[in-house]
Curated annotation (Swiss-Prot):
EC number annotated for this UniProt entry: 6.3.4.19
Subcellular localization(s) per the UniProt record: Cytoplasm
InterPro entries in the record: Rossmann-like_a/b/a_fold, TilS/TtcA_N, tRNA_Ile_lys_synt, tRNA_Ile_lys_synt_N
Family: Belongs to the tRNA(Ile)-lysidine synthase family.
Protein's recorded name: tRNA(Ile)-lysidine synthase
Stored SUPFAM superfamilies: Adenine nucleotide alpha hydrolases-like
């Protein structure tokens, strides 16, 4: 069958990964993907895939469906199968969007924790067209209207979409030919969801396949335009932005004002996302208000967005982490290796004493030591920095200098390395 032959060619792009996981919702598309993947692995004498399913717990039958997936995945030849449960807390707004974010977070975290570098998901051509129409309705820009990538990168995990060039009808024909079983999600027919409306709209067209193909072609044009814009955004970062060792970003206004507005807006956007370490963009309506304020050359800029402070400081715009949004973490000393803090720093603590300590931001009630003041930064930068504390007592301030002194008695040494450049690379690479 055409789909099976084409899949074998596509699979060569991720064949070098020793272990591969497949996200299985139980729908026909993910069941077909798992079936294709297990057959391909057997034929090529490679490691069988791991099946992962997320139980969102949103419907009474959720657990029963998850159990079916685990059992059927084993029958189809999966090496192992796991249920990942979503621990829901105070869900607000769009439940489908929240569930999607949680699903990707759970899948990526499991892969990362189990040293699996490759995750397959079952998006197909019809998903592409429906997503385009949904985003068009919301007024999305070039990025939002771009086609989904065959390969993307999330939290250190490669995500592949091998079925992206196949239609739902092709996938269903394959499933029926191989007598596969799958779950029909009732929400796919619920008209309260906008995606269902657009799915039905496509079905009602005179030639669904042609219309879907043309929508996907437009999305591909948008993808090319987005890549061109990203190229020039990266060049603008080289000219306009300083990423500081102490965990903040400085944008030179003299250069910023010379940029085309679209490039300048993207530069501001990705700077905020890199400091906040978020892969989801802040709301456009909130971002554009701040952007327009920055463009007013005489205006005072002092705003917050997405867990960041955006403020004018001299001839620059500073993007600083908002201290109230930073989570403290507790670690036990002596620490073996480094530890990540706030997705902005890799922290190393040198000291022989055995005890539990807290890595927490410097509070405004605590003094700023002279060696930090000598850097002559905006005061809010200091309050976004990590410190080592025990029972409320300061054990060590941060430093980027291995030969410096950042504590009164030197029993504890605390060295920080900014990871913001890595955050930026993951955001603006194409």
């Amino acid at each position: 069958m055409k789909l099976e032959l084409l899949f074998q060619n596509i699979a060569n792009s991720f064949a070098f990964h020793n272990q591969i996981a497949v996200a299985v919702s139980g729908g026909v598309d993910s069941i077909v993907l798992l079936h294709l993947m297990t057959n391909w692995a057997k034929k090529n004498k490679l490691s069988l895939p791991i099946a992962l399913t997320v139980n969102h717990g949103l419907r009474s039958e959720s657990q029963k469906e998850a159990d079916f997936i685990i059992s059927y995945a084993k029958e189809l030849g999966a090496k192992e199968s796991f249920i990942l449960n979503w621990e829901k807390q105070n869900i607000k707004g769009n439940i489908q969007l929240q569930a999607r974010k949680a699903r990707y977070k759970l899948l990526a975290e499991w892969c990362k924790n189990n040293n699996v570098k490759c995750l397959l998901v079952a998006h197909h051509k019809d998903d592409q067209a429906e997503t385009f129409l949904l985003r068009l309705e919301r007024g999305s820009g070039v990025d939002g209207l771009s086609s989904m990538d065959y390969k993307s990168f999330l939290n250190g995990i490669y995500i592949f979409r091998p079925l992206l060039n196949f239609s739902r009808s092709e996938i269903e024909r394959y499933a029926k030919l191989h007598q596969l079983r799958w779950i029909e999600d009732r929400s796919n027919y619920d008209l309260k969801y906008r995606r269902t409306l657009y799915r039905n709209l496509l079905k009602a067209s005179d030639n669904q396949d042609v219309l879907t193909e043309r929508i996907c072609l437009t999305a591909l044009h948008m993808k090319r335009a987005a890549k061109a814009l990203m190229h020039y955004t990266r060049l603008a970062f080289d000219d306009c932005v300083n990423v500081h060792d102490f965990g903040y970003i400085e944008i030179k206004l003299s250069e910023f004002y010379q940029l085309p507005e679209e490039i300048a807006l993207r530069l501001l956007l990705y700077s905020i996302m890199a400091i906040a370490s978020k892969h989801y963009k802040p709301r456009y309506n909130s971002l554009i208000v701040i952007f327009n304020k920055i463009l007013q050359k005489g205006s005072n800029v002092n705003c917050t967005l997405s867990g960041c402070k955006i403020r004018k400081y001299g001839e620059n715009i500073l993007i600083i982490r908002e201290s109230s949004k930073i989570q403290e973490i507790t670690v036990h000393l002596p620490l073996n290796g480094s530890i990540e803090w706030d997705n902005r720093f890799s922290c190393t603590i040198f000291g022989d004493q055995e005890c539990s300590v807290t890595i927490a931001p410097l509070k405004k009630t605590q003094k700023i030591p002279e060696f930090l003041k000598n850097y002559d930064y905006c005061s809010e930068v200091y309050y976004s920095l990590p410190t080592v504390q025990k029972d409320g007592k300061m054990l060590a301030y941060p430093d980027v200098n291995y030969n410096g002194k950042n504590t009164d008695d030197d029993k504890v040494r605390f060295i920080i390395n900014s990871t913001i450049k890595q955050n930026l690379v993951s955001l603006i690479s194409i």
